[in-house]
């Protein structure tokens, strides 16, 4: 089965996401909670990160029990684990973005993660990465210097030959400077005014 998924652009947690995360949750021979399915969340807002750092909401657990999707025993174990096993803080990026600055977003998310881990006494660490605007080795080094456990790149990968895009597009991206980009309406959310 699929053991790792990426959960991006969520505004709130959903029952299918929680069902996936909890599928197969159990205690091992040493009593340790094992949650075989991993959710890697990508968020740019603190209130959304808080949901992913926390255990699943009781309302969703109740619904999943009533639907026969999880057992009472699984719901009990669910209260001991975060929804996300890893979380990527998405700063200003080339896709849908909330225009967050990496210098303020990552430290805020690290603080929230640490606070939540202490509050719920999690035994496994929640890895925290950074995405958005990471296009150079220096930007990658800066992310790690600020405390990121990993980085996630996106648009910069379109400049690679493996991207399958045209030579012209790859050349334009490789030559682009910071001042050469601007926000534009998002094609799939144009009617809502999203950039």
Protein language model regions, located:
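Catalytic or ion-translocation cores adjacent to nucleophile or general acid/base/metal-coordination motifs
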Residues: 6-7, 11-14, 92-93, 108, ...
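Glycine-rich beta-strand-to-loop/alpha-helix junction loops that act as flexible
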Residues: 1, 127-135, 153
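Active-site entrance/lid segments in N-terminal catalytic domains of soluble metabolic enzymes
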Residues: 1-125, 138, 157
């Amino acid at each position: 089965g699929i053991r790792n998924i990426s959960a991006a652009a969520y505004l709130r947690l959903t029952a299918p996401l929680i069902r996936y995360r909890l599928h197969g949750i159990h205690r091992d021979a040493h009593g340790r909670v094992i949650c075989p399915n991993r959710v890697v969340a990508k968020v740019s807002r603190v209130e959304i990160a808080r949901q992913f750092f926390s255990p699943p909401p009781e309302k969703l657990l109740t619904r999943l029990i009533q639907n026969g999707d999880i057992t009472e025993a699984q719901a009990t174990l669910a209260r001991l684990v975060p929804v996300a096993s890893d979380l990527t803080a998405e700063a200003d990026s080339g896709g849908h973005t909330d225009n967050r600055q990496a210098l303020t977003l990552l430290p805020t998310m690290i603080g929230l993660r640490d606070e939540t881990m202490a509050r719920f006494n999690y035994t496994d660490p929640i890895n925290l990465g950074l995405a958005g605007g990471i296009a150079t080795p220096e930007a990658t080094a800066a992310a790690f210097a600020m405390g990121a456990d990993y980085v996630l790149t996106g648009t910069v990968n379109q400049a690679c030959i493996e991207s399958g895009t045209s030579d012209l597009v790859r050349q334009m991206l490789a030559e682009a400077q910071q001042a050469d980009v601007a926000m534009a309406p998002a094609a799939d959310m144009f009617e809502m005014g999203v950039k």
